[in-house]
């Protein structure tokens, strides 16, 4: 996953 646009704890 690049940039993690769906994880609030990137």
Curated annotation (Swiss-Prot):
GO MF annotations, alphabetized: ion channel regulator activity; toxin activity
Transmembrane segments annotated in the record for this chain: none
Chain positions with Cysteine amide modification: 10
N-terminal signal peptide: none
Keywords: Amidation, D-amino acid, Disulfide bond, Hydroxylation, Ion channel impairing toxin, Neurotoxin, Secreted, Toxin
Tissue: Expressed by the venom duct.
Coiled coil start-end: none
InterPro entries listed in its UniProt record: Contryphan_CS (IPR011062)
List of residues that carry 4-hydroxyproline: 5
Positions carrying D-tryptophan: 6
One cellular component term from this protein's GO annotations in UniProt: extracellular region
Subcellular location as annotated: Secreted
Cystine pairs: 4-10
Family listed: Belongs to the O2 superfamily. Contryphan family.
Additional remarks: Exists in two forms, due to cis-trans isomerization at 4-Cys-hydroxyPro-5.
Function per UniProt: Its target is unknown, but this toxin may modulate voltage-activated calcium channels (Cav) or calcium-dependent potassium channels (KCa).
Entry text on domains: The cysteine framework is C-C.
Protein name as annotated: Contryphan-Bt
Species this chain originates from: Conus betulinus (Beech cone)
